[in-house]
Curated annotation (Swiss-Prot):
PROSITE patterns: UROD_1, UROD_2. This is Uroporphyrinogen decarboxylase. SUPFAM superfamilies: UROD/MetE-like (SSF51726). GO terms for cellular component: cytosol. The record marks D74 as: Transition state stabilizer.
Length: 342
């Protein structure tokens, strides 16, 4: 069997035109997703219903033929599986009770699998339904980003509650990160056991930290996840996405040991090319260029292909696709990437 295109790139081979998939490619910009979401009831019900989660994962594959499917789930299923309450409210996003320092020792990463069984079933079904050419990506949130929601109880603009908690309660915060790391590593291992070809670690709030905190709260826990996953699955590629890491991207790769770097759209292409000399990169089109379409889109795609297409590379956005993105713009982008038009 020929190797899946995404895996070729992740294993260090230059593929042109490059493989393409999009973060949040199963989402509200698709009418078929919105219909399935209505059937599910709540967002969490959708995540935990294997039949519907498989359906929404496959929808962008059927429509666009991306080179990879990414499991439909959410990074916050880990705190939910650790016993924290979780709900999603329209317009407010995820909400949970803020965790207190004295509650952290009671979290047991060994208890997550009962609640996450439906997710593992989704992965198993997806691998059986996807074509041989289409890779399946599993994922988790990075411990720092997951912890920010557990401490604040919701998303906040600058993650001040989590930063303050970490400074005031360093011992308890380190314990929380260790617990999330252990749970996340086991979660990824199980996804790989069920058929995931590669995994991605999303650290959406990595860019909010100072250098010392980045080392302690971002690098150290992710390195532990990578170590544990590699013990069980040494050859499965791991993509790290520390959004906003700026000049610390290179340190992130070196100290965590991830296979590939996901780059956000603020990384200059000259710097992306330098990072690519160290290993595969993924990214990094500004999602607003995809919303805008036209010359803004075609120029963005052209610049990225020209700068990064000559070495191991996966075309993606620099963050998730937004709900207002026109489907026609996605189709135009895919066509330009697949034609390799510079």
């Amino acid at each position: 069997m020929a190797e899946r295109k995404l895996l070729e790139a992740l294993n260090g081979r230059t593929v042109f035109p490059p493989p393409i998939w999009l973060m949040r490619q199963a989402g509200r910009y698709l009418p078929e997703y919105r219909e399935t979401r209505k059937k599910a009831g709540s967002f969490l019900d959708l995540c935990y219903n294997p039949e519907l989660a498989v359906e929404v994962t496959l929808q962008p594959i059927r429509r666009f033929g991306f080179d990879a499917a990414i499991l439909f789930s959410d990074i916050l299923v880990i705190p939910h599986a650790l016993g924290r309450d979780l709900r999603f409210e329209e317009g407010a996003g995820p909400l949970m009770s803020p965790i207190q320092a004295n509650e952290i020792p009671g979290l047991d990463p060994n208890l997550i699998h009962n609640r996450l069984q439906p997710v593992y079933e989704t992965v198993r079904r997806l691998r059986s339904e996807l074509s041989e050419e289409t890779a399946l990506i599993g994922f988790c949130g990075a411990p720092w980003t997951v912890a920010t929601y557990m401490i604040a109880g919701r998303g906040t603009p600058d993650q001040a509650p989590a930063r303050l908690f970490g400074y005031r309660h360093p011992k308890e915060f380190s314990e929380l990160l260790d617990t999330i790391s252990a749970a996340s590593a086991d979660y990824l291992i199980r996804q790989i056991d069920e058929g995931a070809d590669a995994v991605q670690i999303f650290d959406s709030w990595a860019g909010i930290l100072d250098e010392t905190s980045f080392d302690q709260w971002c690098l150290r826990p992710v390195a532990e996840i990578v170590r544990r996953v590699r013990e069980r699955h040494p050859n499965v590629p791991i993509i790290g996405f520390p959004k906003g890491a700026g000049w610390l991207y290179s340190r992130y790769r070196q100290q965590t040991g991830v296979t590939a770097l996901g780059l956000d759209w603020t990384v200059p292409l000259s710097e992306a090319s330098r990072l690519q000399a160290e290993g595969p990169v993924q990214g990094n089109l500004d999602p607003m260029r995809l919303v805008a379409g036209g010359q803004a889109l075609s120029k963005g795609v052209e610049d990225i292909l020209s700068a990064l297409g000559g070495a191991p590379f996966i075309f993606n956005l620099g963050h998730g696709i937004t709900p207002e993105t026109p489907i026609g713009h996605v189709e135009a982008m895919i066509q330009q990437v697949r034609e390799g038009r510079l």
